[in-house]
UniProtKB/Swiss-Prot annotation:
<keyword id="KW-0067">ATP-binding</keyword>
<keyword id="KW-0547">Nucleotide-binding</keyword>
<comment type="function">
    <text>Catalyzes the attachment of glutamate to tRNA(Glu) in a two-step reaction: glutamate is first activated by ATP to form Glu-AMP and then transferred to the acceptor end of tRNA(Glu).</text>
</comment>
<dbReference type="InterPro" id="IPR000924">
    <property type="entry name" value="Glu/Gln-tRNA-synth"/>
</dbReference>
<feature type="binding site">
    <location>
        <position position="127"/>
    </location>
    <ligand>
        <name>Zn(2+)</name>
    </ligand>
</feature>
<dbReference type="GO" id="GO:0005829">
    <property type="term" value="C:cytosol"/>
</dbReference>
<dbReference type="Pfam" id="PF00749">
    <property type="entry name" value="tRNA-synt_1c"/>
</dbReference>
<feature type="binding site">
    <location>
        <position position="103"/>
    </location>
    <ligand>
        <name>Zn(2+)</name>
    </ligand>
</feature>
<dbReference type="InterPro" id="IPR045462">
    <property type="entry name" value="aa-tRNA-synth_I_cd-bd"/>
</dbReference>
<feature type="binding site">
    <location>
        <position position="239"/>
    </location>
    <ligand>
        <name>ATP</name>
    </ligand>
</feature>
<dbReference type="GO" id="GO:0006424">
    <property type="term" value="P:glutamyl-tRNA aminoacylation"/>
</dbReference>
<feature type="binding site">
    <location>
        <position position="105"/>
    </location>
    <ligand>
        <name>Zn(2+)</name>
    </ligand>
</feature>
<dbReference type="GO" id="GO:0000049">
    <property type="term" value="F:tRNA binding"/>
</dbReference>
<dbReference type="GO" id="GO:0004818">
    <property type="term" value="F:glutamate-tRNA ligase activity"/>
</dbReference>
<dbReference type="InterPro" id="IPR001412">
    <property type="entry name" value="aa-tRNA-synth_I_CS"/>
</dbReference>
<dbReference type="Pfam" id="PF19269">
    <property type="entry name" value="Anticodon_2"/>
</dbReference>
<feature type="short sequence motif" description="'KMSKS' region">
    <location>
        <begin position="236"/>
        <end position="240"/>
    </location>
</feature>
Amino acid sequence: MGSGRVRVRFAPSPTGIFHVGGARSALFNWLVALRAGGDFVLRVEDTDASRNRPEWTDGIISALDWLGISPGRYEGPVLQSSRADRHRAAAVRLREAGLAYFCDCTREALAERTGNAQHGYDGFCRDRGLEPGPGRALRFRTPDDGVTTVHDLIRGTPEFPNDTIEDFVIARADGSAVFLLANVVDDLEMGITHVIRGEEHLSNTPKQQLLWAALGAAEPPVWAHVPVIVNEKRQKLSKRRDKVALESYRDEGYLPGAMKNYLMLLGWAPSGDDEIVPWETIESTFDLADVKPSPAFFDEKKLRAFNGEYIRALSVEEFIAAVEPWLAPPAAPWAADAFDAGTFAAVAGLAQSRVSVLAEIVPMVDFLFLPAAPVDDAAWAKAMKGPAAQLLADVHDVFGKIEWDAETLKATLAELGERHGLKLAKAQAPVRVAVTGRTVGLPLFESLEVFGREATRRRIAAARDRLAAG
C-alpha cells in the first residue's frame, strides 16, 4: 500500500468465546494504528448465520473494552452481513470479466476423477460455460503460471507458484460470498492498508492477493501474520483442550494491564531485560518488524505471576476497589449484610501481598464474615492431632486475659506451644484451622487482632469441643 493514512481492522467472527489469540491480534492492530495516528476498524464477520449469536458480538465488544479498546475510539462495529450486496456485486463483476466461472462439481465427482476427495480442484468446469443454477458455485480462475509473492512484515516474502493454487470458490450457489471474497471486498472498500492476523490465515493470503488485483487494487495491503500460540506441549491452543477464553481470565480476577502486557510478549518483546513494562512504553516501542515468526508459548503460570506483580503495584485503595466485585454475593459465600468494609480494609494490605488473582481474596478472608469457620476436612485432619485439644483449651483460656495485639498474641502462643513441646509453626496450625478453617492464609496474628478477642475465642472453643466429642 502507499503512504496514505494507516487503516487496520480487527475482524473476529461471533461464533463462540473470545480467544486470547484474538485478543493479542486486536492489541497488535490497535498499537499499529495508534503509533501511526491511523484508524482501527472493528468488523464483525457474521456471515455464518448458522453459528452466529448476538451475545457473542456483545462479548467481543466487552472484551475489547476491558483491554482498553473502547467504543468511540474506533470505527464500528461493522457487521459484514450488512455488506452482502457489495459482496454479490463483486462476484458478478469477476464473472463478467471472465475471472470466475460456475462449477457444479460435487466432492464425490472430484474424488472419482482424482481418486481423493481432499485433492485440490482439478479445473474440470473451467471451460464448460455453465450458467447460474442450483448446485453451481462460483470459482475464481487462478493464473496458470507465474508466482504470487506475499510481502509479509513478519515472514519475509513467501512465494506461491500459481499452478499450485486451485481455482477456489468465491460464492455459493445462492450467490452469497464466501469468506475469501467477502474479506477482500470489505478490506478494499474500507481502505484497509494493513492486514494483521494469525499465521493460520497465511495459506489464504495468495488467494486473497489475487482477488485484490482482480478487483482493481493497485497493490495489496501490508501483510503481517503473527505467530501461532501454543500450549506447554507445543500444540496450538484449542478451545476444546486449553483455557483460552479471555472472559474466564477476566472473571478469575486477572487485571487488564497484566493481561495486555503478557499478550504482547507472545511474539514480541520490549528492549532490555524487563518483561513487565508500563503500557506507555509498549505503545511507544511496539513495531511489527520486531515480531518473531516462531510459535509463542502461552504460559499460564507466568501470566499468573505477572498478574500478582500488577496487583502488588496497586495502592491499597486501588486494590480494595479492584476486588469489590468478589466481596458480595454471588461471588462471596457470606450474606451481604455480614460484610464489614472496615474489617476488610484492615486486612486488605495483608491480602494484597498474597493473591495472584483477585478471586483468591474470597478464601483468604471468608472466615472474617461467615458465622462459622469454613473448615476443610483435610486441613482439620492435618492440624488437629497430638496435643491440639489441650493446646486449644489453654489458648482459649489465656486469650481471654492478655492484651489483644498481634505481637502479644504471637508471644503467648509461642509460650503455650512450648509447654506442649511444639515450636510456634506447629502450635499455630490448630489455632489457624480453628479460626480460619484452613492451613494457609493471611498472617495469623494480624488476622486474629482484626477478628477480635470474642470471635476468636468462640471459634477456638468450637474446635476444642469438637475434638472433645471425638
